[in-house]
């Protein structure tokens, strides 16, 4: 091959890759992009409140404001992520969320255009919820409950509602009140310290009434909800439960009666002696408030009890409670908090409690498949008392108390299944039908849920459930009989 021909072939080979590469090269021209951290911004109710919007762009962008009642800064930015701060210039004094306007963001060089709506929460909350957790013996579990609420709080929960917590982290003589809320700037749950009560006694009705009254001043709302998480013994007077306030010794062997079995798992029944409040005192404290709680959730043992609920019927509209002991874990707050903002969802709260202990109990601390729950409609309690009064006027049928379903491991038993008790005590079919109708109205069947058994610290074992109406009664018991006959329920149904 001659040298000129070789040079021509070599040149051709060098040119071919260059042409091939030019034909297959990628178009590296970047497409304009504009993304936002939110499609809607909701400002707090007060003037001066702020929220943040993150703008991420591939190049220069601008912002235009439409509406009034808020400002935004900066109004433009460049490549990368820029934080825009929105500031409310006025307070929204209404009871409803207000639409303030919108932000229009665009890229001048024919890029994307996006719109963000801007709203402001009302000064009067849709609902104020208080989680009241007095006492120290369950403090570590209370901390877990509070963390559960933090996990539940997001941009949608509690929405236009507000959540407050009062507990006693330091000692039994002081209390801390704080608010948990969604902070749009950090996109997470934040805490606002409200007040330290330097002198607080959870067993003093005046202290408790003051706390509840000041809550409405701090967070006025269209409706109110209350969760009480502590130890519970239903209607049993403090003097017959553990140590009465001011007493040196428990009465009538009460301390031994309420003694948990050796090695028992903790439940929300025993502890915090000397700081108990009678249910009648709680009812009076609630009734004296300038507002009424729409619901009261007892994260306590034994509170789904007719003697107890009768005392509360004029103080609250709905009650969620358990007829037996609640494991120390308590309610699954990360699951129930999103359900607590409309009365229609109270049944869902019951379901979430039951579902935890029925299906997810392995995730709880003590892994006990023990969870019973009931929803009470308090406006129906008087009607139930009326039919019970007429039942008690009829001759009592003979029955064996030992065959009745009980809900604790105490000896002698104290809490009996009310539905089963009435069915064996009354032989009048018409009255039984009327009782069943009133009972279902007061305690909707779909919200009376139970596991196959319940755990009791008083005998340190699981106990089977063969009858479940969801409500207990203490009348068949031989313990605290004089105290029981002094209850408002007994007097109202035994004329």
Per-segment meaning from a language model:
Residues 250-495:
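Terminal, contiguous helix-loop blocks that mediate binding/assembly
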Residues 84, 94-109:
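A short beta-strand micro-motif common to beta-rich folds, especially ectodomain repeats
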Residues 122-221:
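N-terminal extension/subdomain marker
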Residues 16-42, 71, 106-124:
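Bacterial Sec-dependent N-terminal signal peptides
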Residues 135-138, 169-173, 200, 230-236, ...:
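Solvent-exposed loop/turn segments at secondary-structure junctions
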Residues 33-36, 56-83:
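Surface-exposed binding patches on compact interaction domains or structured appendages
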Residues 1-22:
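Sec-dependent bacterial lipoprotein signal peptides
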Residues 168-193, 227-273:
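Surface-exposed loop and adjacent secondary-structure segments within mature catalytic domains
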């Amino acid at each position: 091959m001659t040298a000129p021909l070789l040079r021509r072939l070599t040149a051709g080979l060098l040119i071919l890759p260059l042409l091939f590469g030019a034909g297959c090269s990628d178009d590296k021209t970047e497409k304009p992009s504009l993304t936002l951290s939110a499609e809607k911004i909701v400002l707090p109710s007060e003037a001066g409140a702020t929220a943040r919007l993150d703008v991420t762009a591939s190049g220069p962008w601008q912002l235009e404001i439409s509406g009034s009642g808020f400002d935004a800064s900066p109004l433009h930015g460049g490549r990368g992520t820029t934080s825009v701060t929105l500031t409310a210039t006025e307070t929204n004094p209404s009871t409803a969320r207000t639409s303030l306007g919108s932000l229009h963001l665009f890229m001048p060089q024919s890029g994307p255009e996006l719109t963000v709506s801007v709203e402001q929460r009302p000064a009067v909350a849709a609902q104020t919820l208080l989680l009241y957790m007095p006492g120290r013996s369950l403090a570590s579990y209370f901390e877990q409950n509070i963390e559960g609420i933090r996990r539940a709080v997001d941009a949608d929960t509690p929405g236009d509602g507000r959540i407050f917590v009062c507990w006693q982290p330091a000692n039994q003589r002081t209390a801390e009140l704080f608010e948990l809320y969604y902070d749009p700037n950090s996109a997470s749950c934040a805490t606002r310290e409200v007040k330290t009560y330097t002198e607080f006694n959870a067993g003093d009705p005046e202290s408790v009434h003051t706390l509840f009254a000041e809550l409405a001043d701090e967070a006025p709302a269209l409706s109110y909800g209350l969760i009480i998480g502590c130890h519970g013994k239903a209607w049993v007077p403090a003097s017959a439960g553990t140590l009465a306030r001011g007493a040196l010794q428990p009465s009538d062997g009460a301390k031994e009666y309420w003694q948990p079995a050796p090695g028992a798992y903790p439940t929300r029944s025993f502890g915090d002696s000397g700081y108990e409040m009678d249910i009648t005192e709680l009812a009076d404290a609630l009734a004296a408030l300038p507002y009424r709680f729409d619901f009261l959730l007892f994260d306590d043992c034994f509170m789904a009890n007719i003697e107890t609920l009768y005392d509360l019927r004029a103080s609250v509209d709905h009650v969620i409670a358990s007829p037996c002991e609640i494991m120390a874990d308590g309610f699954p707050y990360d699951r129930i908090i999103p359900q607590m903002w409309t009365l229609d969802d109270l049944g869902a709260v019951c379901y979430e409690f039951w579902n935890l202990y029925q299906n997810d109990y392995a995730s709880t601390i003590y892994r006990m498949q023990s969870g019973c729950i009931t929803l009470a409609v308090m406006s129906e309690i008087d009607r139930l008392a009326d039919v019970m009064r007429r039942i008690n006027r009829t001759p009592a049928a003979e029955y064996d108390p030992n065959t009745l379903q009980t809900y604790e491991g105490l000896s002698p038993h104290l809490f009996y299944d009310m539905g089963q008790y009435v069915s064996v005590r009354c032989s009048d079919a018409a009255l039984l039908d009327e009782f069943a109708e009133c009972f279902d109205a007061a305690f909707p069947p779909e919200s009376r849920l139970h596991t196959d058994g319940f755990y009791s610290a008083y005998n340190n074992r699981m106990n089977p459930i063969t009858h479940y109406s969801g409500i207990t009664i203490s009348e068949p018991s031989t313990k605290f009989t004089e105290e029981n006959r002094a209850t408002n329920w007994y007097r109202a149904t035994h004329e």
